[in-house]
Swiss-Prot record:
Source domain of life: Bacteria
One GO CC term, this protein: periplasmic space
Biological role: Part of the Tol-Pal system, which plays a role in outer membrane invagination during cell division and is important for maintaining outer membrane integrity.
Leader sequence segment: 1-21
Subcellular location: Periplasm
Protein name: Tol-Pal system protein TolB
Subunit structure: The Tol-Pal system is composed of five core proteins: the inner membrane proteins TolA, TolQ and TolR, the periplasmic protein TolB and the outer membrane protein Pal. They form a network linking the inner and outer membranes and the peptidoglycan layer.
Organism this protein belongs to: Wolbachia sp. subsp. Drosophila simulans (strain wRi)
A Pfam family reported for this protein in Swiss-Prot or TrEMBL: PD40
Keywords of the record: Cell cycle, Cell division, Periplasm, Signal
Family of this protein: Belongs to the TolB family.
GO terms classed as biological process: cell division; protein import
Length: 420
């Protein structure tokens, strides 16, 4: 049965203060994607007001549509009277000075005739997109009861051919909606596996030169970078600890590939796995008590979990399906582990419980890999490679398994999504 939320969200010009209300829809008890939402704009006095209100309305509509919880109507469809039983977002702005505008809104329940929320914000015109994301977060928070992720970012490897048809790889970062793309490296060296720090202020990545591996931290605020550590051999698959104090890495040297913990303060390393097995792709649980990783301890590549609260710290195998398993990533909620599965020449992105139960495959393809979680714990971004010259980023949701491509101007791979 289609769910309608009897709410109207008006953006007015007369509310100079903030208040809050506690009302939300329990999505666990609702039909996902069936919350009716109409996004429209009010008549504006100036050309600037009209242009920016339309832009902000478009950002809000796109954000809430893409999150998979709302059935969003825009344009002519939004002008019909069917919105009376849907949630309505009406965008309007007022110019305060040459470059400053005021955006205010109230949340109104048409069923109970009760005002639920009033807010107002003054912002420079250049920040209109950020304001659109902010309003999207507020709507998501009030209607769903969960913090929105619309002011987060995506990092990935951008790859294209230069004039000599040589592959050039750069670290890229962009807003979650694909806007404001920036390249953090210039393509003069091989780079791999960018990963956000827990606070989102930095990105760590690996660079290789002269037979050595360099772990580099990029400061996103001032664009400076520093070498955290240098290793002989090959380092791969860096992953921050949830508290941001250490890194998990995979290190290959002398015929062994083991997982190390690197303390970011002392720069000291500690071996977590030992032996001749190839162990890689480590990922902490959110509480930092467990670590998932892939290894061929049993003879084939499988998923394992180490319990750090257990003195023995013996790896426990959790994958028992046919095929090989790789790149485990713990969800931000701690309830699932995403992974790549390779079976009979096909690749799959799937999830399972931390104990290995309830395995579900969400997507399949010629070559799909490198899953990373969105902050909401309900969607996964991954790499889909159709050919050596065609790799793109895709999203898949856990409930309906709907997929959509994330637009990038070049080939893209190895994504990571910042948390709140």
């Amino acid at each position: 049965m289609k769910l309608f939320v009897h709410l109207v969200l008006f953006i007015s010009l007369f509310i100079p203060y903030f208040t809050k209300a506690a009302l939300y829809v329990d999505i666990k008890k609702s039909s996902v994607g069936n919350i009716g939402l109409v996004v429209s704009k009010c008549t504006c006095k100036t050309a600037l007001e009209s242009e920016l209100s339309e832009n902000i309305a478009k950002v809000i509509g796109t954000n809430l549509s893409n999150c998979g919880l709302f059935n969003v109507k825009r344009g002519a469809e939004a002008e019909s009277k069917s919105w009376k039983s849907d949630t309505v977002v009406t965008v309007s702005l007022s110019e305060i000075s040459g470059s400053a505008l005021e955006l205010s809104f109230r949340l109104f329940d048409t069923f109970t005739k009760r005002e639920l929320l009033t807010q107002s914000v003054v912002f420079p015109a250049k920040d209109w997109r950020k304001i659109g994301h902010l309003v999207s977060d507020v709507i998501h928070d009030r209607l769903i009861g969960e913090k929105g992720h619309f002011n987060t970012k995506i990092t990935y490897i951008a790859e294209e051919k230069d004039s000599n048809y040589k592959s050039v790889r750069k670290i890229a970062v962009m807003n979650q909606d694909g806007s404001n793309i920036k390249y953090l490296t210039n393509g003069d060296r091989f780079v791999s596996t960018p990963r956000f720090s827990p606070n989102g202020k930095g990105i760590v990545y690996i660079s290789y030169a002269n037979g050595k591996s360099y772990i580099i931290l990029k400061n996103l605020k001032d664009n400076t970078e520093s070498i955290i550590s240098t290793f002989e051999g090959v380092v791969s698959a860096p992953r921050f600890s949830p508290d941001g104090k250490s890194l998990l890495i995979s290190h290959s040297l002398g015929g062994e590939t083991n997982i190390l913990s690197l303390d970011l303060s002392s720069k000291r390393t500690k071996k977590i796995t030992k032996g001749s097995a190839i162990s890689t792709s480590p990922s902490f649980s959110p509480d930092q008590k467990y670590m998932a990783f892939s290894s061929d301890i049993s003879g084939s590549q499988q998923l394992y979990v180490i319990d750090f609260t257990n003195k023995s710290k013996k790896p426990k195998r959790i994958s028992f399906g046919s095929g090989r398993y790789a790149t485990p990533v713990w969800s931000p909620k701690g309830d699932l582990i995403a992974f790549t599965k390779i079976q009979s020449g096909k690749f799959y992105i799937g999830v399972m419980k931390p104990d290995g139960k309830e395995e579900r495959l969400l997507s399949e393809g010629h070559k799909i890999e490198s899953p990373a979680w969105l902050p909401n714990g309900r969607e996964i971004i991954f790499t889909r490679t159709e050919s050596p010259s065609n790799s793109k980023l895709y999203l898949v949701d856990l409930v309906k398994k709907n997929q959509k491509m994330v637009s990038t101007p070049t080939n893209a791979s190895l994504p990571d999504w910042s948390y709140f």
